Amino acid sequence: MHLPIFLDTDPGIDDAVAIAAAIFAPELDLQLMTTVAGNVSVEKTTRNALQLLHFWNAEIPLAQGAAVPLVRAPRDAASVHGESGMAGYDFVEHNRKPLGIPAFLAIRDALMRAPEPVTLVAIGPLTNIALLLSQCPECKPYIRRLVIMGGSAGRGNCTPNAEFNIAADPEAAACVFRSGIEIVMSGLDVTNQAILTPDYLATLPELNRTGKMLHALFSHYRSGSMQSGLRMHDLCAIAWLVRPELFTLKPCFVAVETQGEFTSGTTVVDIDGCLGKPANVKVALDLDVKGFQQWVAEVLALAS
């Protein structure tokens, strides 16, 4: 059986790898993509997502989502992904367009049509998911689970404690984490371990057309380097769906700080149960790195 998934994304260079895996992993059935402002503006993330779908000739509907966070000014990660979000490769022109409805309504409609509950995968800020849950609460029974790339049980990557996807819209993340749906959180604790080695990166141009494209993008990606290895943050969310045995998870109570002067966007992960609150998130805390690297090599070899 193929696992049906909807993917909410903000491409982004490592998003491109995650999208490739979502399309080509034989265990998955990617049925809908939605975009959100995050790494770059939503206009750019939508353009990038459509370019990738055209590159792979993938007939997957795509809806453009939120352009700004729920209540605060937008921030981006152009310093990591470049101003366009996917600099380094010249994609061919196409005439693909997004659906004519907002992302959260596209997700709602697709959930209500689905014959079984669907797994949502969110690898950008959680604005679209928060809009779905707050505006369309009738959809909750149709969500099997939500798997996210975001958060951290320890250090952050855009502030001392906050990870970018959560910090970009803390109010949205807080809404999602309070929603009661099943959540699997793949945060920096595992994604900082998810490194593609220089030796493997050097093989990509000869792998296939996807490898050549990704190698060109990686030369502009600033989450590591081609000489030291590159962190594949977003890919971890897809990897968990296919190879959950590679991850060590612990059910924890997780809250999102929205008010702190220095801690806004922090995921407060109660690993030891100090707060006495019931767990609401399965938090990934460790990764089988060699197993992850082997799986990445296998799935990208299929991405022709």
Swiss-Prot record:
One of its GO terms (molecular function) is uridine nucleosidase activity. The keyword Transmembrane helix does not apply. Its EC number is 3.2.-.-. It holds the Pfam family IU_nuc_hydro. The keyword Hydrolase applies. Keywords: Glycosidase, Hydrolase. InterPro entries: I/U_nuclsd_hydro_CS, Inosine/uridine_hydrolase_dom, IUNH, Nucleosid_hydro_RihC_nonspecif, Ribo_hydro-like. Belongs to the IUNH family. RihC subfamily. This is Non-specific ribonucleoside hydrolase RihC. It comes from Shigella boydii serotype 4 (strain Sb227). The gene is rihC.
